[in-house]
Amino acid sequence: MNTQLTVIIPVFNEINSIEQLLIKVLNNKIDKQIIVVDDHSSDGTRDLLINKFKNKVDKIIFHQKNLGKGAAIKSAQKYIIGKYTIIQDADLEYDPSDYFSLINEAEKN
């Protein structure tokens, strides 16, 4: 079966929210690929990703300098395998529990 969804998560100094976000994304039952792009964080985000999530997400990309959100998304593009792609900000502005309804709407059109 093909992967339904690729979730790209660009992060920069998100030590206060990234763990909670990744747990929510991982707990979502939709068939997904998770790509995290760390845009040269300096607050411990990088270490947290390595120590807690390197074997739980599909891909972690580390930028050697801060390049911005657009560059983070672009870095992930070549690894996308999902039928659909979502850019999930690390600040939890968008709830991962909405993935099913977003996919359902996309499938209708």
Annotate each PLM feature:
Residues 1-109:
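Structured catalytic core of nucleotide-sugar glycosyltransferases
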